[in-house]
């Protein structure tokens, strides 16, 4: 099994993260709003957070990024994106399983939001035991998902 590790982002990762976002999420974004390169790049520039986001590496290759917020009552998975060339290899499952274990150990829920049309991601989250809580956004474009809280 290929080792999966995380490293903090640096300013040098800005373009990698934008291109990753385009490859991993571009189809969903285009289906919902249409892909506007300038608007997406401006949004990315506002949100890019070196040192807080983490780069996912598999076998020493940068394959994705993850952003996790540790809140007082929950762990919130703000973003996980894996390049399509590396999807389906268990990388996301391993990272999500580790977050679910950490949430259980803390006595907290893992919470995330996912595009409603992203059926593949929703199926993965459900397979790992997360449940859909509530759709939201204009036209219910996203759904909040939550793990069942289990105390250690």
State each model region's role.
Residues 4-19:
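A short beta-loop-alpha structural element at the N-terminal edge
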Residues 25-45:
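Conserved GNAT-fold acetyl-CoA-binding loop/helix
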Residues 44, 125, 130:
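Conserved active-site tyrosine of GNAT-family acetyltransferases
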Residues 82, 88-101, 123-127:
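Conserved acetyl-CoA-binding loop-helix of GNAT-fold acetyltransferases
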């Amino acid at each position: 099994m290929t080792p999966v590790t995380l490293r903090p982002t640096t300013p040098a990762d800005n373009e990698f993260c934008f291109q990753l976002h385009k490859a991993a999420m571009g189809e969903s974004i285009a289906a919902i709003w249409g892909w506007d390169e300038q608007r997406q790049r401006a949004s990315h520039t506002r949100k890019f957070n070196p040192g807080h986001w983490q780069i996912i590496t598999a076998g020493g290759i940068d394959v994705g990024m993850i952003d996790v917020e540790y809140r007082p009552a929950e762990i919130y998975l703000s973003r996980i994106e894996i390049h399509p060339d590396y999807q389906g290899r268990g990388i996301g499952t391993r990272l999500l399983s580790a977050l679910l274990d950490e949430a259980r150990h803390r006595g907290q829920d893992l919470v995330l939001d996912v595009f409603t049309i992203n059926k593949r991601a929703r199926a993965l989250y459900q397979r790992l035991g997360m449940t859909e809580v509530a759709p939201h956004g204009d036209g219910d474009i996203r759904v909040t998902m939550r793990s069942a809280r289990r105390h250690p």
